[in-house]
Design a protein with these regions (language model features):
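Metal-dependent phosphoester/phosphodiester hydrolase catalytic core
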Residues: 30-433, 442-443, 451-490
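N-terminal secretory signal peptides and thylakoid transit peptides that target proteins
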Residues: 1-18
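General helical secondary-structure elements
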Residues: 3-4, 24, 37, 236
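Generic low-complexity, intrinsically disordered sequence content enriched
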Residues: 14-15, 23, 93-96
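Residue-level marker of structural boundaries
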Residues: 19-20, 469
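C-terminal segment of classical bacterial N-terminal signal peptides
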Residues: 20-28
Length: 490
């Protein structure tokens, strides 16, 4: 793999105002009814539109390819106030930009009112250039420590202005740990966590489909399952799928076929092709019988002592006991073996799902095959696996492994594989958390998002900073670091 890395510092852009999605008002409509849209699971011929309205009403979606006429219509659905409803837009064309509007009316209204026009992109065909974006851990529950709401709106407005085909969140965006610690992890409170995040993601969600990667603080994890339908893992899994349309295996996506009682399909790991690239997400949390990272509702000190709280099993020190599991590994291996894509991008919350650093810990356990003493015990510990995860990715020339968890931007490389650690989008302390865990690489402080432009000759990665007017030490949309990755040889 050929990699070109260059530093850039472009002072450009201004702070974009937070973009709220509101229905336009008219003499025949209500005054500015709020409309919150999250697009998801786009394919070459369909897309899901998850809609929340502030009042109960009947709605349908009209759409077309010109922005002037909207000849295609969805089914008319009855929406209850503040309740997410999914519209499936079908019979679409691949590699096509679509424009759409929401038509809505309350009970007793004579005619349907019309929202403003939005747009989305169906799956690109091979040879077509495109861009996608992503950001690391949001942690809205850590306001004042590594999260600021105003700054998050700025970061999302920056993403919206770029018009990327889709956006990926890297996990720890819907933490329910505080609820579990207080004994308040019920359905209403867990769903509120997922609903509230749409206030920020609504800035991009009407035009940019959102993909989610599972993180440790979501506590959507196997170790918490206890047979009840009210345990935190089931509540988190259901809330995720209720408010964010994520992929399940079909003709376009491959992924987790497991059905969990009370949830159904987890939609936690999946893959898809888009243009010249293959995208793969991984998840160790739903496939480990023990806590991979922090135990739900337990402090850092108690975690160190392996104490249990909030249900489920305690955290283990032997990380051979946790991981992605045989089924997910076999799927991952097959997905890598069968692709002809020029680029492969893999997304996971963190190497092994826990710890700090990237290449520094990539030689350990199922990721690299060694135990803490540096002895290779892979064959005994994973007898059904061909290679450790890192070696499997190197064999198949994965372009970039993206991870979150560490709250810092770092670009590293091992064996020709780039490890890209992702920054927080809205940390107003602009810190480089866990910097000491990274012994090498290009480092940059929070906050902002990463954009990847994928073309026939290279994929260009850029880290865009987010800044408010009062953040005079930085410029909004300044490029803190950029590099290019060449296509893999297949």
């Amino acid at each position: 793999m050929q990699i070109e890395i260059t530093r850039r510092s472009l002072l450009a852009g201004v702070i974009y105002g937070a973009l709220a999605n509101f229905i336009g008002s008219s003499s025949k409509s209500y005054a500015a009814q709020e409309l919150n849209i999250i697009l998801g699971r786009p394919t070459s011929n369909s897309i899901a539109l998850n809609l929340i309205t502030s009042n109960s009403m009947s709605c349908y979606i009209e759409y077309g390819t010109t922005g002037r006429t909207f000849p295609q219509k969805s089914a008319i659905l009855q929406l209850s106030a503040a309740t997410p409803t999914v519209f499936e837009l079908k019979s679409l064309k691949p590699n096509q930009k679509y424009f759409y509007r929401v038509r809505f009316k309350a009970s007793g209204a004579a005619t349907y009112s019309i929202s403003k026009s939005y747009n989305f992109q169906t799956a690109r065909t091979p040879g077509k250039s495109f861009a996608f974006s992503l950001h690391g851990d949001t942690h809205p529950e850590r306001a004042g420590k590594m999260f600021n709401s105003e700054l998050y709106y700025v970061a999302m407005a920056n993403v919206a202005a770029q018009g990327n085909d889709f956006h990926i969140l890297m996990g720890d965006d819907f933490s329910i740990d505080p609820l579990i610690a207080k004994g308040q992890a019920n359905k209403e409170n867990v769903e509120k966590i997922y609903r509230t995040h749409r206030d920020w993601l609504g800035t991009i969600g009407a035009t940019t489909p959102v993909f989610l990667v599972n993180g440790n603080h979501e506590q959507a994890a196997q170790y918490l399952l206890d047979g009840s339908l009210t345990n935190p893992a089931v509540l988190a899994g259901n809330a995720r799928n209720k408010f964010y349309p994520q992929p399940a295996p079909d003709a376009f996506y491959t992924g987790d076929n497991l059905d969990v009682p009370g949830i159904g399909k987890l939609r936690d790991y999946y893959s898809w092709h888009w243009g010249d690239a293959l995208f793969i997400t991984l998840d160790p949390y739903w496939h480990s019988k023990y806590a991979v990272d922090n135990v739900a509702g337990v402090s850092v000190e108690d975690n160190a002592n392996n104490k249990k709280n909030g249900g489920g099993a305690s955290k283990v020190s032997d990380l051979w006991q946790v991981g992605i599991g045989d089924e997910q590994y076999a799927w991952f291996k097959k997905t890598l073996e069968t692709t002809k894509a020029k680029y492969i991008f893999v997304f996971t919350h963190h190497v092994m799902g826990t710890g700090r650093g990237a290449i520094e810990v990539s030689e350990n356990y199922e990721w690299g095959g060694k135990d803490p003493k540096g002895v290779t015990t892979f064959a005994a510990q994973r007898p059904n696996w061909e290679l450790p995860i890192h070696d499997l990715m190197v064999k198949h020339k994965v372009s970039i492994l993206f991870q979150g968890h560490d709250h810092i931007f770092v670009t590293q490389q091992r064996d020709g594989l780039i490890y890209q650690s992702m920054p927080n989008p809205a940390d107003d302390t602009f810190s480089m958390f866990n910097e000491s865990a990274y012994k090498s690489g290009v480092k940059a402080p929070n906050s902002g998002h990463v954009r990847v432009q994928v073309g026939a000759d290279e994929a260009k990665v850029e880290y865009f900073l987010a800044a408010r007017a009062k953040d005079t030490s930085r410029k909004n949309m300044q490029v803190a670091h950029s590099y290019s990755v060449k296509p893999r040889m297949v």
